[in-house]
Swiss-Prot record:
Name used for this protein in its record: Probable cytosol aminopeptidase
InterPro entries: Leucine_aapep/pepB (IPR011356), Macro_dom-like (IPR043472), Peptidase_M17_C (IPR000819), Peptidase_M17_leu_NH2_pept (IPR023042), Peptidase_M17_N (IPR008283)
UniProt keyword annotation of Protease present: yes
NCBIfam families linked: PRK00913.1-2 (NF002073), PRK00913.1-4 (NF002074), PRK00913.2-2 (NF002075), PRK00913.2-4 (NF002077), PRK00913.3-5 (NF002083)
Primary localization: cytoplasm
Annotated source species: Rhizobium leguminosarum bv. trifolii (strain WSM2304)
Sequence positions that bind Mn(2+) 1: 267, 344, 346
Compartments, record wording: Cytoplasm
Cofactor(s) annotated in UniProt: Mn(2+)
One Gene Ontology term of the molecular function aspect: metalloaminopeptidase activity
Amino acid sequence: MSAKFEISFSKSAKLTGGLAILLKTTDADSAAGAETVDPAGVIAKAARIARFSAKSMSALDIVAPEGASVERIVVIGLGKAADLTAHDWLKAGGTAAARIKNTDKTAVFIDVPGRETSARAAADFALGMLLRTYSFDTYKTKKNDDEEKAGKSVKVTIVTTDPAGAKKAFSDSEAIAGGVNLARDLVNEPPNVLGPVEFAAKAKELEKLGIEVEILTEKEMRRFGMGALLGVAQGSVRPPRLAVMQWKGGKAKDRPVAFIGKGVVFDTGGISIKPAAGMEDMKGDMGGAAAVTGLMHVLASRKAAVNAVGIIGLVENMPDGNAQRPGDIVTSMSGQTIEVINTDAEGRLVLCDALWYCNDRFKPQFMINLATLTGAIVVALGNVHAGLFSNDDQLSAQLTEAGLSTNEKLWRMPLGKDYDKLIDSKFADMKNTGGRQAGSITAAHFIKRFVQDTPWAHLDIAGTAMGSPQDEINQSWGSGFGVRLLDELVRAHYES
């Protein structure tokens, strides 16, 4: 459950109790709004005593003195004014949200002395608040005081010089928060609740936003020849699904942009079973599908001027008497045959059929797939960057730029013939793993064999989609990584 902020923007705020939040840079003598909130100079005295230097994302919490117009004052440090980025405004909003406790109304003075604060910055600050307050407590029957208060409504007035512009920009912020938090919800859901059929039903709910949604059943996928995807699913009693989402916000003649997500709702590893320790985290092996679903929610909610396709392959990978075996050979939708060496390298088998289907049907401008694909990428990049693999330099540059802008950072990894040959098979056209060395790269090469000449990028988000370190705007196990990144890519380069 998320805290319910009723956010509005104004040139001034009526201060009668509640909380006032002020922002201060290291190079300003005082915080914006200080003369309104603190005519007696309590902030300066408290800062001196606490040695508060306004270091980036630091906070000073003050109980207002008798006779003040508010009950509490929080000053948030921003560091140097000249160094402020869009992501800093998000972080400041998250830092502020964490300080809003035991109050039903808050005024935030967002303008920074000596620097013009844009409407976009005010909206980013508000977005940071919405992202920070997300929590997933659906299944808790007993909640502590903070959890009980999280569901209560708090009125937040953000004081800025351009409230009309901020309000307009904030409509996009609300759309983004909705998509990110949808992705987080999907990743956090327990696997007994969210199977392939249930996930597909969640995608179907996007129809209320104007998205066209088709759900392919096992019978339909078999007719298309999706033997790779179906091979993964055959060990589970829960039938697979392929959800196809279309947002038609661009011109009718414009080719769509396409996003494909791995949706393994639970991954035991199959017959090549994983160790028991930590297996519960494999409910998050559908983080790619969650991100694609969240992205489609954003694009429709903000009425993006683009044609976009989102496709998610939904399966459960289980050991069973009917499960796929190491040594099996399956035929993909492309007609290429695959020797299954390791049933725990299943995500690429799901993606290869979904990508081929997408390319064959929609002829998109590009395809970007997202997947919690390999542990090897976590070893290489940790939880800071997601791995980027691509056959197109322009698309890679655009993605890298969007990653820096949103702080959902990517690091481009190499591709080449010397890696590609590692997945050649003696018995089929290819095998589904190239061994322990260069595991993330050989996985990417496997996927690359199914994209033909279409510009393509593969984002390995195994280290960033779940269990990544908590920060100012994310306190959730499932982070929603990829939603803001890809929305920024579309916004910056592909809207008509």
